[in-house]
């Protein structure tokens, strides 16, 4: 098979954020593997860096004629191989294209990474298109756009001699070129968001308010996809600390309370239901009570905001105003209203592993918590807390 180079991923200004580079690898033909142990030992002792370890079980691929010993030689390793290659004739050098992100971690949670194809994946895919040493999209755009980015393999039919050496090419079918993808992300804004997060846990998503196009999507901590793509050497995934979950895309997979961002929606619903108007005044003393003896729902500002109307309540983010408003609404009406704005749904972004948000109802709480819905639950929803996420 002749495999086309994987499609490029660019930004609208032409900046390439995912491309392909040539790397040098070493392989041995499967039929020579058992009889060439001395050559393999010499390779690891005299050519490869000390960090390389030989794992026969990992290398043994029974259904392919090649066994890859190393897939990404450093310049020093390549130089040592050139010196020693006549003493290890069974081990051959071959150039391969590898996926490469020139900006490494910056777009890791958008682009994602490739990985060695699994046995389960091979069951549903063409073996001609995906031999056992293939790299395939595992997450992010690399996975969701795998078919677009991969293209279709061509074929080169060769005549070989008794030793397997090429004599001539009999027939060639040109591979179909893959598609390139252009993203709406803004490089400078993406970089600023990454730097401000400084590898602390968090996420930043920014949309163009006029078009809805995503300009920033950053999740932190992040990781270097090139190590998993095989285009750079580095610590394996197993050696990477998992405590901070660098592979978890907090921007689309994490579920968090919407908090005060929900207040304009609750205010709009209050206007629609004619419970309030733009001049309705609420006395914010720093807490709200349904009754004199009832629980106090405290606002973020201890001494309150004083007399507030809807505009001031949104500008100063008065919790008490929205506690009181939510207490006059029902969870049924709140849920149905928020559903119209996409709450409780997935956005449909063309990335993998997006989590569906939680928009609670009476039945949801009964089924998931095993309890009835209380007015206090509705009050918490009014400021984007409680069961909503």
Give the positions of each predicted feature:
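Beta-lactam-recognizing serine transpeptidase/beta-lactamase-like catalytic domain environment
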Residues: 18, 160-169, 209-260, 265-389
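Sequence/structural segment immediately N-terminal to covalent heme-attachment motifs in c-type
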Residues: 206
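Extracytoplasmic/periplasmic proteins that interact with beta-lactams or build/remodel peptidoglycan
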Residues: 1-203, 218-250, 255
């Amino acid at each position: 098979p002749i495999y086309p180079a994987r499609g490029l991923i660019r930004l609208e200004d032409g900046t390439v954020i995912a491309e392909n580079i040539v790397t040098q690898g070493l392989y041995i033909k499967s039929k020579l593997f058992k009889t060439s142990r001395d050559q393999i030992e010499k390779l690891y002792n005299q050519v490869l860096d000390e960090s390389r370890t030989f794992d026969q079980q990992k290398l043994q691929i029974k259904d392919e004629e090649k066994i890859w010993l190393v897939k990404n030689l450093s310049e020093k390793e390549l130089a040592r191989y050139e010196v020693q290659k006549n003493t290890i004739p069974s081990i051959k050098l071959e150039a391969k294209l590898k996926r490469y992100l020139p900006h490494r971690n910056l777009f890791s949670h958008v682009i994602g990474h490739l990985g060695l194809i699994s046995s389960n994946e091979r069951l549903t895919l063409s073996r001609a298109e995906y031999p056992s040493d293939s790299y395939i999209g595992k997450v992010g755009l690399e996975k969701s756009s795998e078919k677009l980015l991969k293209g279709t393999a061509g074929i080169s039919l060769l005549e070989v001699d008794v030793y397997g050496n090429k004599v001539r090419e009999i027939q060639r079918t040109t591979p179909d070129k893959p598609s390139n993808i252009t993203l709406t992300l803004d490089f400078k804004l993406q970089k600023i968001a990454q730097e401000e997060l400084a590898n602390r846990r968090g996420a930043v998503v920014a949309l163009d308010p006029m078009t809805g196009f995503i300009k920033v999507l950053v999740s932190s901590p992040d990781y270097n996809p090139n190590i998993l793509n095989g285009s750079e050497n580095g610590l394996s995934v197993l050696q990477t600390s998992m405590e901070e979950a660098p592979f978890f895309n907090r921007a689309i997979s994490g579920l968090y309370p919407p908090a005060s961002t929900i207040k304009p929606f609750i205010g709009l619903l209050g206007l629609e239901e004619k419970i309030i108007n733009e001049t309705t005044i609420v006395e914010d003393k720093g807490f709200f009570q349904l009754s004199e003896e009832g629980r106090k729902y405290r606002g973020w500002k201890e001494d309150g905001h004083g007399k507030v109307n809807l505009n001031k309540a949104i500008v100063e983010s008065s919790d008490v105003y929205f506690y009181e408003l939510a207490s006059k609404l029902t969870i049924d009406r709140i849920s149905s209203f928020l559903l119209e704005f996409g709450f409780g749904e997935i956005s449909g972004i063309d990335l993998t592993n997006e989590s569906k948000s939680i928009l609670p109802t009476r039945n949801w709480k009964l089924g998931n918590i095993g309890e009835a819905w209380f007015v206090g639950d509705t009050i918490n929803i009014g400021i984007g807390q409680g069961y909503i996420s």
